[in-house]
C-alpha cells in the first residue's frame, strides 16, 4: 500500500487498482500549496468523512477532472451533486453500512464531531453525521481513517468487527482529540501495525507537532509513520 499525505487529513491511498483520495482538502489548505490537479491524477475514488470545508474543499474539482466515484454519507453526496458532481457516480452510505466500491469495500463508522459546510453569508448547511471510514482491501491490510473524532469506547467494537491494521488518527486537539488521548485510543482499543497521525500543524489553534502522540505510543510496538507533506511512503 502506498500512502501520500497532503497535510491535515488529506491522503492518497494506492493499492491494487484502487487510487483513493480521502478528505481532499486541496484548495485553501495552508499545509499544501501544490494544487489539486496532481493529487487528482488517476484517482478512482473520493472518500469523505464529513462535510467541513477543511475536508471537502477540493472534492468537486477532483471529481470533475477524474470522473472518480464519490463515497460519502447521503447528505454530502446530495449536496455535492447539487453543486455539480455527477449523480451517476455517487456511492452513498451511512453509519453502520458497508458499500462495495469495486475492488474494495468501505464501512461507515461513527465519529464524535460535527458536520456542516459554511456558505456565503454565514449560513451553515447540515451535512449529516460525521464518521470514520474502514477500508477493506482483499489483498492488503484493512485501513481505518478515523475522520475527526474524540476517543470513544465503541472503538473496541470497530476493532472487533474490522481488525484494522493501519490507522489514520487525528491528534491536533481543540477540534479533535489531542495526541496523548489519541495514543491512548490506539493502545487501548486497537492492534494497529502502523498509525499515521493527521489533523495537526495546519492552523495555529491546533497542536503543531505529533510529539505527544509519539510519546504516548513509546514501547507499544506500534509503528508511527510520519510522511512529509507531499511524500509517498509504502506501508
Curated annotation (Swiss-Prot):
Signal peptide: none
SUPFAM superfamilies (UniProt xref): Metallo-hydrolase/oxidoreductase
UniProt entry keywords in alphabetical sequence: Hydrolase
InterPro entries registered for this protein in UniProt: Metallo-B-lactamas (IPR001279), RibonucZ/Hydroxyglut_hydro (IPR036866), UPF0173 (IPR022877), UPF0173_UPF0282_UlaG_hydrolase (IPR050114)
GO molecular function, one term: hydrolase activity
SMART domains (UniProt xref): Lactamase_B
Gene3D superfamilies with a match to the protein in the record: Ribonuclease Z/Hydroxyacylglutathione hydrolase-like
Keyword Hydrolase recorded: yes
Pfam families (UniProt xref): Lactamase_B_3 (PF13483)
Family: Belongs to the UPF0173 family.
Protein name, per record: UPF0173 metal-dependent hydrolase mll0680
Classification of source organism: Bacteria, Pseudomonadati, Pseudomonadota, Alphaproteobacteria, Hyphomicrobiales
Amino acid at each position: 500500500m502506498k500512502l501520500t499525505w497532503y497535510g491535515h487529513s488529506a491522503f492518497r491511498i494506492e493499492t491494487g487498482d484502487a487510487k483513493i483520495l480521502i478528505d481532499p482538502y486541496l484548495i485553501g489548505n495552508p499545509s499544501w500549496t501544490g494544487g489539486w490537479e496532481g493529487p487528482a491524477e488517476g484517482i478512482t475514488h473520493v472518500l469523505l468523512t464529513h462535510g467541513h470545508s477543511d475536508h471537502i474543499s477540493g472534492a468537486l474539482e477532483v471529481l470533475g477532472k477524474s470522473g472518480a466515484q464519490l463515497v460519502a454519507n447521503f447528505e454530502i453526496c446530495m449536496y455535492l451533486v447539487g453543486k455539480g458532481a455527477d449523480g451517476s457516480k455517487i456511492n452513498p452510505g451511512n453509519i453502520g453500512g458497508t458499500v462495495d466500491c469495486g475492488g474494495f469495500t468501505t464501512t461507515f463508522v461513527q465519529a464524535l464531531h460535527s458536520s456542516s459546510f459554511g456558505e456565503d453569508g454565514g449560513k451553515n448547511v447540515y451535512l449529516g453525521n460525521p464518521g470514520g471510514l474502514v477500508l477493506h482491501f482483499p489483498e492488503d491490510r484493512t485501513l481505518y481513517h478515523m475522520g475527526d473524532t474524540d476517543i470513544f469506547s465503541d472503538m473496541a467494537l470497530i476493532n472487533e468487527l474490522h481488525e484494522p491494521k493501519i490507522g489514520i488518527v487525528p491528534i491536533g486537539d481543540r477540534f479533535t482529540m489531542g495526541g496523548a488521548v489519541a495514543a491512548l485510543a490506539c493502545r487501548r482499543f486497537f492492534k494497529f501495525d502502523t498509525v499515521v497521525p493527521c489533523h495537526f500543524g495546519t492552523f495555529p489553534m491546533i497542536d503543531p507537532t505529533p510529539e505527544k502522540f509519539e510519546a504516548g505510543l513509546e514501547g507499544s510496538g506500534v509503528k508511527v509513520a510520519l510522511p512529509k507533506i507531499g511524500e509517498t511512503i509504502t506501508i
